[in-house]
Amino acid sequence: MKRRLFALALALLLAVSLPVSALVRDWYIDDGDITINATADGKQTVKQGNKDAADDDPTITQRDSSKETSNTITIDADEHTTANVTLDGVNINTDADANRRSETAFRTEGEGDVNIELDGSNTLWSGYSSNAAGLNKGNSGTLTINDEDNNGTLEATGGYGGAGIGGGQHSSASDITITGGTITARGSNGGAGIGGGASDINGPYCNGSNITISGDAQVKAQGGTEHNEYNEGAGAGIGNGGKQGKNEAGKKVPVDGDKVEPDTSGLTEKRETRILRTRRGYGK
């Protein structure tokens, strides 16, 4: 009996003494906002509420993805570091909560790189008054979206003036690479589908540049509305945002890495472009 009690006590002691990262497998977005930090010392930590753990490759999921959550994801990567995360069935819509409409569904920050792996069906919808992209690229390094298992989808929709994937209102976005997954990106009120956000009437275009789509990626990108009561220029499907207060549409940019460059000749009318699946690089 004493041996059994001793063994039980030892097991409990070991469980308590294990680092938090050894006990954490998945992070549930239902439980609150999640922040991932990749620091210059080579460490990556994940914070959610009072939980703070070392985790080099976290998976963020949701217990019931049929229900929208207004909780958000932030990734901050220091210079010369790469932050990694897997999205596995999250359904974030900060516009669905009246108290969270100024929040960004998913944003990246810092001077490092960010890698996102897709599993399952994922939705990122930033609140209307956030003026942000659905997946808001704020880091100055690269943003790469992968789908190694070929089972991931991502639907990203921007808030007012924001791109689907890329810059928020009055912000450019560059160095975006999509190598896999089925991606639908919708800009809002002049934001590009993938690329820059909307700019104001007297400002320069918010550029979307160095955008590469390759591998098994299937992408549908739709720029924000062209005409409404505010006379806003449409965002390109892939490229620059439009100009708000002036009917000037954003310009498309060449997309590197894909065999078939998207046809955006009718962008002003249709505000939509599709990229076909291919395994070969553009021009090869």
Residue positions per predicted region:
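A composition-driven surface/loop motif
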Residues: 6, 22-284
